[in-house]
């Protein structure tokens, strides 16, 4: 095809990419998380992209808490958090696991970092 390539206009730019299909990834956060800020971020994320986020679950290190908090949701529905009484085996950091369809995991990483201001955040398989 010899036709010139043009970039899509910003008005037509979407963060949905059907070529991505169903994928999963984890956010690993090596800093304590402010509970209110996290709740606001997750609410906004699921409000905007809940139809593309099939599942989110995780264990969080919350500022001021001695033990982790477990969270989970399905699309637009978030269940009540569970305050755990012990730490599971392994490293004591926050981890959120997402199952997505047609949504770039990099978008979730960028939004989390921008919204929370936390820098010790990475993705994992």
Task: Give a label for each model feature.
Residues 1-91, 101-125:
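C-terminal accessory "lid"/substrate-recognition subdomains
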Residues 98:
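Flexible loop/N-cap segments at domain edges
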């Amino acid at each position: 095809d010899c036709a010139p390539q043009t970039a899509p206009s910003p008005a037509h730019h979407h963060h949905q990419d059907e070529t991505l299909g169903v994928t999963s990834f984890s956010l690993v956060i090596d800093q304590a998380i402010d509970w209110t800020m996290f709740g606001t971020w997750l609410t906004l994320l699921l409000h905007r992209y809940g139809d593309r986020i099939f599942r989110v679950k995780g264990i969080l290190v919350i500022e001021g808490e001695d033990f982790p908090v477990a969270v989970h949701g399905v699309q637009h529905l978030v269940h009540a958090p569970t305050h755990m009484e012990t730490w599971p085996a392994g490293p004591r950091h926050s981890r959120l696991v997402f199952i997505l369809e047609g949504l770039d995991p990099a978008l979730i990483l960028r939004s989390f970092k921008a919204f929370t201001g936390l820098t010790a955040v990475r993705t994992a398989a």
